[in-house]
Regions:
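Acidic-aromatic substrate-binding/catalytic surfaces of carbohydrate-active enzymes
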Residues: 397-422
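Metal-dependent polysaccharide deacetylase catalytic core of the NodB/CE4 family, i.e.
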Residues: 88, 93-170, 229-265, 296-314, ...
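C-terminal domain-boundary segment and adjacent tail
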Residues: 187-207, 260-393
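N-terminal secretory signal peptides that target proteins for export/translocation
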Residues: 1-11
């Protein structure tokens, strides 16, 4: 009889211990769970393509880049990232032609990138129309390309894989709505902030941090529930706010200074050299990870680094540079100065933002940046940006001379906006 009592006593104790263990584990997991607020994020993406600008499935402009896409180049690129930031997760995007190409270098390259998904947790996704899909295709055609391109990515990776985001350069509101409602993808790099008179396409008037786009226009933050597309619209490159005032490249002290100067490689490391280039990249990063973090309670820096750049000096010159030395310096210095910063995929970041913000009502971004002294980022100038659902506004002043602030941009979002027709 006593033995029976002991057995009855032991069973409840073991259950209680199990419950205690589970609760402890859940508590630890909750503490470790990544949140948007309180963190600094870097999202780093790359593009695998065949031609410089692939305007449609079978048409393209610019240079044939097939000779500078190789598994060796991709391996060197990915190992540089892992050595500089162990555990970093990046996003790979493939163009239509890069998914279809059966030449050995592309077959092997696709296999290698799939192995990085398995090894590092990298995201693999699709790039429609070489950043400018809507300039060369109807919205209906872009939707077809998105559907079939994403299918090809899933088949390439296998195991029911599905990316959380798409890289698109610029993407019309209707196409972002299609992604959310038909493809179940709620994150899109569908906006290149303040890109004007650069490359083959423009997009001007948006805010630079994440937002839900309006059904009227991809650059306009949604004004309400009926207007909102449930697809987090992301910028492609974090730029120096001061340098971005200039619409076209200018030569300053013999250096070609582009308006896209910030953390992208072409306008910094490749044109200006490693020392000056990384100095600008870190100055732009600090504007977000220091002052921006204090103002917004989180910070985000993002860059798309085309895979072709690893060997692009063979075609475009770039003074013989591939930028990997600068990439290593930049990533290592970020980790040294902001050791708690997270490098996660574009899809992961967008979904964290989506968890925090259910609409645009409470977004209230503020930025303050003083010039780096490089190119158009004048050392004596200070710019302030205010960005929310209702408007964006920029104030400029000479902080060394303590001059009054000058209003240089005020864009209202309560006004109707219309995208160009197909």
């Amino acid at each position: 009889m006593e033995m029976i009592k002991m057995k009855r006593f032991k069973t409840p104790i073991s259950v209680l211990l199990l419950i205690q263990f589970v609760l402890l584990h859940l508590n630890i997991s909750a503490q470790e769970r990544l949140t948007l607020l309180g963190n600094r994020f870097l999202t780093f993406s790359t593009v695998v393509r065949v031609n410089q600008i692939e305007t449609s499935r079978d048409q393209f402009h610019g240079t044939d880049e097939s000779g500078i896409h190789s598994p060796e180049g991709a391996r060197k690129f990915r190992e540089t990232i892992e050595n500089s930031w162990p555990g970093a997760r990046i996003t790979w995007s493939f163009s239509w032609l890069a998914l279809k190409d059966q030449r050995p270098n592309y077959v092997d390259l696709r296999k290698l990138v799939v192995s990085y998904h398995k090894k590092y947790g990298d995201e693999i996704t699709f790039l429609p129309g070489g950043y400018f899909a809507n300039m060369y295709n109807t919205r209906e055609q872009v939707n077809r390309d998105l559907h079939e391109g994403l299918q090809m990515v899933s088949e390439m990776v296998g195991g029911g894989y599905r990316p959380k985001s798409v890289i698109a350069g610029f993407l019309a509101a209707e196409n972002q709505q299609y992604l959310a409602e038909k493809e179940g993808i709620h994150v899109c790099q569908g906006n290149i902030w303040s890109q004007y008179a650069v490359d083959n396409g423009d997009g001007e008037g948006s805010i630079s941090y994440p937002y839900y786009p309006s059904r009227e226009h991809f650059c306009k933050p949604a004004q309400g529930k009926k207007d909102m597309i449930d697809c987090v619209n992301l910028d492609g490159w974090t730029v120096d706010f001061l340098n971005a005032r200039y619409p076209v490249p200018r030569f300053i002290n013999g250096i070609r200074c582009g308006s896209r100067q910030g953390v992208g490689p072409i306008e910094t490391i490749l044109r200006q050299g490693t020392e000056i280039g990384t100095s600008e990249m870190l100055a732009t990063t600090a504007a977000h990870f220091d002052t921006g973090f204090a103002l917004n309670k989180f910070a985000w820096v993002t860059s798309i680094w085309e895979m072709s750049l690893v060997e692009a000096y063979k075609v475009y010159g770039y003074n013989g540079r591939n930028g990997l030395d600068g990439l290593e310096i930049w990533l290592k210095e970020i980790r040294r100065r902001w050791p708690q910063a997270k490098c996660i995929t574009q899809g992961e970041f967008g979904m964290l933002w989506r968890e925090q913000y259910k609409n645009n009502d409470s977004i209230n971004y503020q930025f303050v940046q003083r010039g780096s002294g490089i190119c158009g980022s004048e050392a004596e100038m200070e710019i302030k940006w205010f960005m929310n659902k209702d408007f964006r506004m920029a104030l400029l002043r000479d902080w060394k001379a303590n001059s009054p602030e000058k209003l240089i941009d005020f864009t209202r979002y309560d006004l109707k906006a219309v995208e160009p027709e197909d």
